[in-house]
């Protein structure tokens, strides 16, 4: 069992029951999945970009991402339907908890001028989104082997009904909120 998964069962659940007064353990919000998405609009010019991004995401997530394709043609962006324009990977279960552990304890402190993550990036339904500007904050990425700095979106989907519950859940996982 992953360290954060054990921590959730032993410390987070009792703390949230006490704070919000849940009657059942099943009412306590939990993280269902973490989705990592890399949009690669510049990949229309060079197919190697997709391969490099897939390699980076594989190292970061620990599992192979799926290449996302354009749903429809957009002449302004010079893309046709079916063109590969991104890569995404969905983490659940033990892999999700291990990624969350590495993200909070190792990757976030490596961000330059880091003052905490925004407490306002919740979507109103208890899900949290965070953007990472460069993939080199993850220790799995070798700085000398990357071809370009690429950002990625990280979506944390929870069973929380409100943003306050989701924020309390993530804060109990030692998420460094600045406000």
Swiss-Prot record:
InterPro entries (UniProt xref): Ribosomal_uL5 (IPR002132), Ribosomal_uL5_bac-type (IPR020930), Ribosomal_uL5_C (IPR031309), Ribosomal_uL5_CS (IPR020929), Ribosomal_uL5_dom_sf (IPR022803), Ribosomal_uL5_N (IPR031310)
Coiled coil feature spans: none
Keyword entries, A-Z: Ribonucleoprotein, Ribosomal protein, RNA-binding, rRNA-binding, tRNA-binding
Keyword ATP-binding: no
Similarity annotation: Belongs to the universal ribosomal protein uL5 family.
Role played: This is one of the proteins that bind and probably mediate the attachment of the 5S RNA into the large ribosomal subunit, where it forms part of the central protuberance. In the 70S ribosome it contacts protein S13 of the 30S subunit (bridge B1b), connecting the 2 subunits; this bridge is implicated in subunit movement. Contacts the P site tRNA; the 5S rRNA and some of its associated proteins might help stabilize positioning of ribosome-bound tRNAs.
Protein's recorded name: Large ribosomal subunit protein uL5
